[in-house]
């Protein structure tokens, strides 16, 4: 391992281990818990003392997926929550079989905004060719379940 690779590894680890603040001021755990492997890196402290600079520690940690498992019920709840929070949808008219255009009165631009909100909620991109077919909350639930391999 070259010095450049070691330096990059150290800076990545330092950035990963630094606690991050969210808007509310609460400290959250950084992505260190999501790392699959850690490599040999120098001991990190706020100020590296002369003693620690030449020493190396090997940390062997293996963690698996940080994503909570999805279920159809959870996908259903999340889709309906996102739609209820959309200001152009009347929550009293909303159910899983409501058609976005015919029942809820949305136009094509609103439909695009709904699809973008679903992309943000579930963390993956929905291609335009697929988005055109998602005209009901039930269609979105089925699409997300298929994409995330959720079968019940």
Swiss-Prot record:
GO MF terms listed in the record are: acyl binding; acyl carrier activity; structural molecule activity
Q: Which residues carry this modification: O-(pantetheine 4'-phosphoryl)serine?
A: 108
Q: Does the keyword Mitochondrion apply?
A: yes
GO terms (BP aspect): [2Fe-2S] cluster assembly; mitochondrial electron transport, NADH to ubiquinone
For this protein, the record's PROSITE patterns field holds:
CARRIER
Q: What is its main location?
A: mitochondrion
Q: Which residues form the Carrier domain?
A: 73-148
Q: Which Pfam families match?
A: PP-binding
Q: Which GO terms describe its cellular component?
A: mitochondrial [2Fe-2S] assembly complex; mitochondrial inner membrane; mitochondrion; respiratory chain complex I
Alphabetized, the UniProt keywords read: Electron transport, Fatty acid biosynthesis, Fatty acid metabolism, Lipid biosynthesis, Lipid metabolism, Mitochondrion, Phosphopantetheine, Phosphoprotein, Respiratory chain, Transit peptide, Transport
Q: Where in the cell is it found?
A: Mitochondrion
Record InterPro entries: ACP, ACP-like_sf, PP-bd_ACP
Q: How does it assemble?
A: Complex I is composed of about 45 different subunits.
Query: Could you tell me what this protein does?
Result: Carrier of the growing fatty acid chain in fatty acid biosynthesis. Accessory and non-catalytic subunit of the mitochondrial membrane respiratory chain NADH dehydrogenase (Complex I), which functions in the transfer of electrons from NADH to the respiratory chain.
Q: Which family does it belong to?
A: Belongs to the acyl carrier protein (ACP) family.
Record NCBIfam families:
PRK00982.1-2
Tell me which HAMAP family the record gives.
Answer: Acyl_carrier
Check the record and name the PANTHER family matching this protein: ACYL CARRIER PROTEIN, ACYL CARRIER PROTEIN, MITOCHONDRIAL
Annotated protein name in UniProt: Acyl carrier protein, mitochondrial
């Amino acid at each position: 391992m070259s010095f450049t690779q070691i330096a990059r590894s150290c800076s990545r680890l330092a950035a990963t281990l630094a606690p991050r603040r969210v808007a509310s001021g609460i400290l959250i755990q950084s992505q260190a818990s999501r790392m699959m492997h850690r490599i040999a890196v120098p001991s990190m402290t706020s100020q590296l003392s002369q003693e620690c600079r030449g020493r190396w520690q090997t940390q062997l940690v293996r963690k698996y997926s940080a994503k909570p498992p999805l279920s159809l019920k959870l996908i259903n709840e999340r889709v309906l929550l996102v739609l209820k929070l959309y200001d152009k949808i009347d929550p009293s008219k909303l159910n899983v079989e409501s058609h976005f255009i015919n029942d809820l009165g949305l136009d094509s631009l609103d439909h695009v905004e709904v699809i973008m909100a679903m992309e943000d909620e579930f963390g993956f991109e929905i291609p335009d060719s697929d988005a055109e077919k998602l005209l009901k909350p039930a269609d979105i639930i089925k699409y997300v379940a298929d994409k995330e391999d959720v079968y019940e």
